[in-house]
């Protein structure tokens, strides 16, 4: 099916390849399940990300720093002679794909966006780790303002099971309710037409369970991005669930601060807790156990594949020296299974390989919070290193839009 694309790639006819693939997708989206097409999709997204990140002066400065515990600038007497593309790729990508910067691909062929909205589905603990702990908090409004691409956020509850959050997704998709790109409540909601769904962490299984249970929404979903999504569950969630599953948590108001402080000492404040009567700590962690998530994938992968939605997954990878000190134990524990974990998930857990229409786009060099959240408040950074979260999230968000647009999926 993808042989014409392979011939175009061998000739270096990148514009012809992009145009031909767009035509093929228009005829039959299942072409995105072809292994050769998946290779191109990953390569193209990484190229778009690298190109956009080179426009980010902060990202280039971070990419030029010597690797170490303390973020220091490169001394002027030791200039970095690598190209901007090489610096970005080697700092923010992992694995063999860091060599993608070698090939110069054409700029994105992005159509005008008229009827497509990006909907961000947040993860567990959203807004609870600190007052700024929202995925793409600063980047989403900047991208919307710069390019005119609409972005809203579903008000998924930060601490209850996946199925329970379906009503929150309905509120966003059917009524346009939730938050705007800058995390301000939407006061005059308008239901979106076509949507790009971006699920971060637990937000990804929230979205997947919703789509499996409500396939009638598939025609409105042009693509779904799983951003460090806990699709296969989490060993960390397994351990926490085993500890709390028999606790009497009848009063979320009384126990919430105590439980959250175990996850991130001294971070949560009472004023950050919303929708207290809806908290279900046990249900939240149970839905993230490897048993629950793998059972879901075994049962529902055929359903998800039949929806015809292109699924894209992106994972993170870090090392023990690059995580906050209170996440070190979990990172070391996960290293027994996968040295390239993101401090909360293994690579296999962040992928969606049981769904043929799913493509893994990239392994990013950053821990689970770095690739989504802005820097933690200064007082928290004084207590632990590796909370500055320098990953170029704006470039990643732009590349998601550009890939989807170039494939002819947006309207």
Stretches found by the model and what they are:
Residues 121-126, 200-201, 229, 316:
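Glycine-rich His-Gly loop
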Residues 167-289:
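Serine-dependent carboxylesterase/thioesterase catalytic core
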Residues 1-133, 142, 411:
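Flexible, membrane-associating and regulatory peripheral segments of lipid-active enzymes
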Residues 2-38, 55, 301-411:
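C-terminal catalytic-base region of ester-bond hydrolases, centering on the histidine
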Residues 131-133, 235-240, 322-327:
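Short aromatic-enriched loop/helix-cap "lid" or pocket-rim segments at secondary-structure transitions
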Residues 126-135, 242, 334, 383:
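Short, flexible/disordered intra-domain loops and linkers
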Residues 108-195:
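Active-site catalytic motif of lipid deacylating hydrolases and related acyltransferases
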Residues 262-326:
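Serine-hydrolase catalytic core
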């Amino acid at each position: 099916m993808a042989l014409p694309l392979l011939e175009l790639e061998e000739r270096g006819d990148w514009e012809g390849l992009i145009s031909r693939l767009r035509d093929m997708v228009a005829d039959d989206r299942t072409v995105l399940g072809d292994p050769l097409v998946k290779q191109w999709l990953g390569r193209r997204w990484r190229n778009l990300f690298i190109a956009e990140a080179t426009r980010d002066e902060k990202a280039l400065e971070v990419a030029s720093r010597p690797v170490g515990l303390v973020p220091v600038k490169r001394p002027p007497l030791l200039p970095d002679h690598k190209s901007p593309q090489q610096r970005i790729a080697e700092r923010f990508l992992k694995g063999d794909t860091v060599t993608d910067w070698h090939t110069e691909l054409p700029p994105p062929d992005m159509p005008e966006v008229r009827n497509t909205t990006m909907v961000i589905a947040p993860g567990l603990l959203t807004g609870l780790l600190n007052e700024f702990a929202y995925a793409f908090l600063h980047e989403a409004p900047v991208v919307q303002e710069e390019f005119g691409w609409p972005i809203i956020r579903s008000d998924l509850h930060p601490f209850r099971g996946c199925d329970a959050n379906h009503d929150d997704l309905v509120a966003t998709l059917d009524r346009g309710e939730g938050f705007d790109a800058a995390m301000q409540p939407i006061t005059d909601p308008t239901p979106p037409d076509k949507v790009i769904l971006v699920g971060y962490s637990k937000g990804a299984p929230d979205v997947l369970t919703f789509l499996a249970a409500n396939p009638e929404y598939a025609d409105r979903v042009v693509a779904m991005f799983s951003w460090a999504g806990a699709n296969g569950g989490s060993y960390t969630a397994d351990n926490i669930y085993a500890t709390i599953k028999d606790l009497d948590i009848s009063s979320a108001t009384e126990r919430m601060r105590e439980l959250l402080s175990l996850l991130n000492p001294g971070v949560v404040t009472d004023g950050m807790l919303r929708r207290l009567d809806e908290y279900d700590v046990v249900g939240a962690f149970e839905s993230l156990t490897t048993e629950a998530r793998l059972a879901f994938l075994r049962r529902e992968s055929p359903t998800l594949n039949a929806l015809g939605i292109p699924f894209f997954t992106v994972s993170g990878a870090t090392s023990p020296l690059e995580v906050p000190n209170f996440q070190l134990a979990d990172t070391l524990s996960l290293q027994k299974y996968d040295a390239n974990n993101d401090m909360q998930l293994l690579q296999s857990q962040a992928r969606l390989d049981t769904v043929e229409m799913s493509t893994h786009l990239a392994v990013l060099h950053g821990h689970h919070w770095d690739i989504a959240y802005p820097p933690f408040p200064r007082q928290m950074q004084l207590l632990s290193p590796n909370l500055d979260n320098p990953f170029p999230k704006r470039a990643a968000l732009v590349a998601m839009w550009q890939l989807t647009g170039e494939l002819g999926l947006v309207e």
